């Protein structure tokens, strides 16, 4: 995302009902990449996953990025979803700021209604049917929310993740998603390269 593209405040959700597809890793990578394009203090990562993956990593690696830990669990769902919603509303009046929300796995309808209020949803998934099937169901639920409220946002971007090097055939994914209003982003290759990029500092987060 180029600097001149971040004039208006943006809320980006990283979401999928399926666990283990790389939501926290993608949130970390996105925050670090944006920190090279815009002032890091203009970036807030809201970690709603009880595992605290994004919180623990970014607090140590990029303390200049704002991190808020608001776990969305059955015990705290109503309160913390309301707090996340408040953050997003406040962010709308802060031009040049970006909020990244790392969401947990699960099927909370209230959470997905909140996700639908964002500017963009990044949806990581592997190419396996075990991940593509629930991913398609999640996209279908987002389509329904957008249709119900006649909304053009959020933009849905599917992020092929954990892709082996040399893998070039994405026809299975394209076929599964052809009837949905989504964009398929560039593949994120095997995370061994990511760990190398972080000079060994990144632990085994791929199942977070």
Residue ranges: model-predicted function:
Residues 6-21, 28-101, 105, 109:
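P-loop/Walker-type NTP enzyme "switch/lid" segment
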Residues 135-151:
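Conserved C-terminal guanine-recognition region of P-loop GTPase G domains, centered on the G4
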Residues 24-29, 136-139, 171-174:
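Short amphipathic alpha-helical segment that frequently serves as the phosphate-/nucleotide-binding helix
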Residues 162-167, 174-205:
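Beta-strand-loop-alpha "switch" segments that mediate conformational coupling across diverse proteins
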Residues 110-129:
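Inter-motif core of Ras-like GTPase G domains
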């Amino acid at each position: 995302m180029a600097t001149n593209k971040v004039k208006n405040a943006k809320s980006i959700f990283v979401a999928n009902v399926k666990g283990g597809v790389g939501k926290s890793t993608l949130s970390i990578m996105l925050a670090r990449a944006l920190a090279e394009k815009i002032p890091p203090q203009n970036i807030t990562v809201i970690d709603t996953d009880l595992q605290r993956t994004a919180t623990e990593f970014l607090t140590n690696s990029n303390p200049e990025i704002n991190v808020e830990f608001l776990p969305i669990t059955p015990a705290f769902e109503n309160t913390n979803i309301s707090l996340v919603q408040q953050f997003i509303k406040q962010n709308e009046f802060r031009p040049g700021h970006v909020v990244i929300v790392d969401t947990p796995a699960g099927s909370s309808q209230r959470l997905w209604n909140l996700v639908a209020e964002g500017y963009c949803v990044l949806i990581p998934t592997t190419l396996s049917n075990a991940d593509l099937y629930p991913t398609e169901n999640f996209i279908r639920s987002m389509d329904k929310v957008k249709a119900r409220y006649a909304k053009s946002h959020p933009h849905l971007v599917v992020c092929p993740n954990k892709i082996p090097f040399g893998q070039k055939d994405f026809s299975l994914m394209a076929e599964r998603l052809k009837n949905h209003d989504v964009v398929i982003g560039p593949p994120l290759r095997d995370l061994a390269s990511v760990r190398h990029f972080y000079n060994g500092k990144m632990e085994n987060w791929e199942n977070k």
